Amino acid sequence: MLNRRILLTSAALAPLAALRTAGASAGVAKPVSIRLPRPTGPFPVGTTELHLVDASRDDPFVPGRRRELMISIWYPASRLTALAPYLPPLTADVFGEGAAIALQQPVGTIDWVGAKSHAGLLAPVCPGMRPVVLFSPGFGVPRGLASISVAELASRGYVVVTVDHTYEVSGVEFPGNRIEVQTLPPAPYAMLARTTRFADLRFVLDSLTRLARGDNPDAERRRLPHGLGNILDLGRIGAYGHSAGGLSSIDLLVADPRIRAAIDLDGELGYGYDDPADAPTVAKGTNRPFLLMGSGAIGPGPHDHPTDPSWGLFWDHSTGWKRDLNIPNGRHYSFVDYQALIPWFQRFFTVPEELIANTVGTANANQVLRAMRTYIPAFFDQHLRHRPHDWNHALPETKFIA
């Protein structure tokens, strides 16, 4: 049970985050376009990307290279511009070939490369100090696959920074039409991934400090939206993530005082340890606010703190505000864009039943999306903006464990 949710990508869902496969060809006359729900907040959303190079750190996955990352910054805009791609084109190409395997459809059935987000590329910044939220994706999953919740937060006045963890994810596109694909050392590599993610996120925080001071941390010093650094309120930073990204967010909450609150979306906290009690994050706990959001049964029971020992120990060792929310009929990928994408694909072709069961389960998709777009902003509103939320009444398809 210990790592089943973090490593699910390597099992039933592996092709959705897989490497490029040989012999790909497409004879699809009219590819299916991606359609995602629009954000509901009052602000248009803008986005830009940055290439970050950590000159102080060698890459643990590829010796002899400095660690480099790609991040996206989503922010409240004053007006919408031409929409940014859903995924960078080279990333979309790699991801699409893997997705075709999982969906049992020819490559090209879905137009991943042409898909658009709901954010304007380099849109003008809406002035005003904004709380900042980091997002870390699951193991092997591109940062763009959480666009629904990310755009929702940005439309409600947050600056959201999404991070690709290079060489762990299926493919990361860098400037100059360069892509770095998944490059993992021989197993076991769980501890390496955990410590690397933690260092990645701390480096991103340092880079945001540079940006707020007026510097441009992009390695190529590409143009950024005017005034982007001026809206970063680095005294109000939260973090959230899915699967391994949820673990990374809680690691950061416990160890880095810059993080004031965090959400873990279905990520077990004992990753890399035979006994979850040995994980420093679990053993230490926190006095800062956190929200656990777990899925339904994959194994002995639902993912909640009474069932998952790593969640239970962390819960017992933590003394601050805490909530445990479960989606009983959802599954591990109900917390990211698959919850909307898979029902959309079902309109055009048959999606394998096993894939549905292992990714989003049987929960009503619209209700799960409603819950995600309610509880994530509500949590950060309460703890970064001092806007209380009533946590006593669960929405449909959700259950409060504690």
Where are these regions (language model features)?
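Alpha/beta-hydrolase-fold serine-hydrolase catalytic core, especially in secreted/extracellular enzymes
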Residues: 32, 37, 55, 329-402
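Alpha/beta-hydrolase active-site loop
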Residues: 181-230
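N-terminal export signals
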Residues: 6-26
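Short substrate-entry loop that stabilizes the transition state in hydrolases
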Residues: 125-130, 139-171
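Short glycine-enriched nucleophile-adjacent loop
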Residues: 246-255
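Gly/Ala-rich beta-loop-alpha elbow adjacent to hydrolase catalytic centers
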Residues: 241-245
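The feature captures the conserved acid-bearing segment of alpha/beta-hydrolase catalytic domains
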Residues: 261-332
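Domain-level recognition of soluble alpha/beta enzyme cores
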Residues: 27-132, 354-365
